[in-house]
């Protein structure tokens, strides 16, 4: 008789991966990375435990949008005060903080729970090709 193995976070074999975002479409990149962060690429996926791997995204400022989304896409946030709805286009956001577009896309694809917050901490987005996580010996990961 087969037994179902339940893997908890202590038994999770977490790896480090580095993903190059250069010339990658933001949405496709975000969907793939969110899947790796959640651990859905592993055969031992458990939905209620942090099973995902660590992901470093380099060249985040070189991720692309399709069509005219660079000028047309608008990001909104609210200050909490009446009339406090703020908006910024993708082009202005990229100029202000190059990593924010990729971070926001991935964060939106992760669960909005305590577990999702833990999984967000496993993501490291870097503008440029150099990162400070070489000591972890990350493996290269291609976006499917």
From Swiss-Prot:
Record flagged with keyword NADP: no
Disulfide bond residue pairs: none
InterPro entries with a match to the protein in the record: Ribosomal_uL13, Ribosomal_uL13_bac-type, Ribosomal_uL13_CS, Ribosomal_uL13_sf
A GO BP annotation: translation
Keywords from the named record: Ribonucleoprotein, Ribosomal protein
Domain of life per record: Bacteria
GO CC, any one term: cytosolic large ribosomal subunit
Entry GO MF terms: mRNA binding; structural constituent of ribosome
Pfam families, alphabetized: Ribosomal_L13
Function description: This protein is one of the early assembly proteins of the 50S ribosomal subunit, although it is not seen to bind rRNA by itself. It is important during the early stages of 50S assembly.
Subunit comment: Part of the 50S ribosomal subunit.
Family statement: Belongs to the universal ribosomal protein uL13 family.
UniProt-recorded name of the protein: Large ribosomal subunit protein uL13
Species name: Mycoplasmopsis agalactiae (strain NCTC 10123 / CIP 59.7 / PG2)
Taxonomic path: Bacteria, Bacillati, Mycoplasmatota, Mycoplasmoidales, Metamycoplasmataceae
